[in-house]
């Protein structure tokens, strides 16, 4: 009975063996992490084979861009502002792989880095020239106050300290735009809808608007074009597209 009552002694593991085991586990974890990083790096550096047709298509795109820009130079009326409106809204509708360097740099200057992103632009001769340069890849027109308000209220975001912040706090707006007389969301909407002398500062405070487009819709190019319309200038009809994508 005494033997049954005795507790079984658990064999103790030497301390030096425990240290070795812990060091071995840490080494294996480090090696696994390094292997994962190396795998990702190899995957990112994979060669991408392109068909001959893609080079031909890129060359055709660049030539078309070059001819279009040359036509703008010899046809001054093409650069005239279509209507007396102070504000335009631009939406990128096409991919820009293989386009000319001028078109790509203009797209980046407008801030349209992502497909179906949109920005507000103050209508000037310089901005109209930029829009005409990239017209086959964007659609643009003149938004009304209702469209401006709905876009900012629903999708308005600001980039602060490399972080995207939704426009839900007037304190943030006043902190960054107060010196321009913009202290709340209503002031911001008014400054965008009716561009004043501080339009550039206020629009730079806003992130590009990422609009809502179903993935399956973009795959069906024929149906998508029929529903969304073609790129280019569309005047007041841009408001209908904003309602559709907002």
From Swiss-Prot:
Quote any Pfam family the record assigns: Ribosomal_L30_N
Q: To which protein family does this belong?
A: Belongs to the universal ribosomal protein uL30 family.
* Keywords, sorted A to Z: Phosphoprotein, Ribonucleoprotein, Ribosomal protein
Phosphoserine carried by residues:
54
Protein name (record): Large ribosomal subunit protein uL30-like 1
Which organism's genome codes for this protein?
A: Mus musculus (Mouse)
What are the leading ranks of the lineage? Eukaryota, Metazoa, Chordata, Craniata, Vertebrata
- A GO molecular function for this record? structural constituent of ribosome
Question: Sorted alphabetically, which NCBIfam families does this protein's record hold?
Answer: uL30_euk
GO biological process annotations for this chain's record? blastocyst formation; maturation of LSU-rRNA from tricistronic rRNA transcript (SSU-rRNA, 5.8S rRNA, LSU-rRNA)
**InterPro entries, per the entry:** Ribo_uL30_ferredoxin-like_sf, Ribosomal_uL30, Ribosomal_uL30_CS, Ribosomal_uL30_euk, Ribosomal_uL30_euk_arc, Ribosomal_uL30_ferredoxin-like, Ribosomal_uL30_N_euk
Q: Which Gene3D superfamilies match?
A: Ribosomal protein L30, ferredoxin-like fold domain (3.30.1390.20)
A GO cellular component annotation here is: nucleolus
């Amino acid at each position: 009975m005494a033997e049954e009552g005795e507790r079984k002694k658990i064999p103790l593991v030497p301390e030096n063996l425990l240290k070795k085991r812990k060091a071995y586990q840490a080494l294996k974890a480090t090696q696994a992490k390094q292997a994962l990083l190396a795998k990702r790096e190899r995957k990112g550096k994979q060669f991408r084979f392109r068909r001959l047709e893609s080079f031909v298509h890129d060359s055709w795109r660049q030539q078309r861009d070059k001819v279009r820009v040359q036509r703008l130079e010899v046809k001054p009326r093409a650069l005239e502002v279509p209507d007396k409106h102070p504000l335009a809204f631009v939406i990128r509708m096409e991919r820009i792989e293989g386009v000319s360097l001028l078109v790509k740099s203009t797209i980046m200057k407008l801030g349209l880095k992502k497909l179906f992103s949109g920005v507000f632009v103050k209508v000037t001769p310089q901005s109209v020239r930029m829009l005409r340069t990239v017209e086959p890849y964007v659609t643009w027109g003149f938004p009304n106050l209702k469209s401006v308000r709905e876009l900012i209220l629903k999708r308005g975001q600001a980039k602060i300290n490399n972080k995207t912040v939704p426009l839900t706090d007037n304190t943030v707006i006043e902190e960054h735009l107060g010196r321009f007389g913009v202290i709340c969301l209503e002031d911001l909407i008014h400054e965008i809808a009716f561009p004043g002398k501080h339009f550039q500062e206020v629009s730079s405070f806003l992130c590009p608007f990422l609009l809502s487009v179903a993935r399956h819709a973009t795959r069906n190019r024929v149906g998508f074009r029929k529903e969304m319309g073609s790129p280019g200038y569309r005047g007041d009809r841009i408001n209908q597209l904003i309602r559709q994508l907002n």
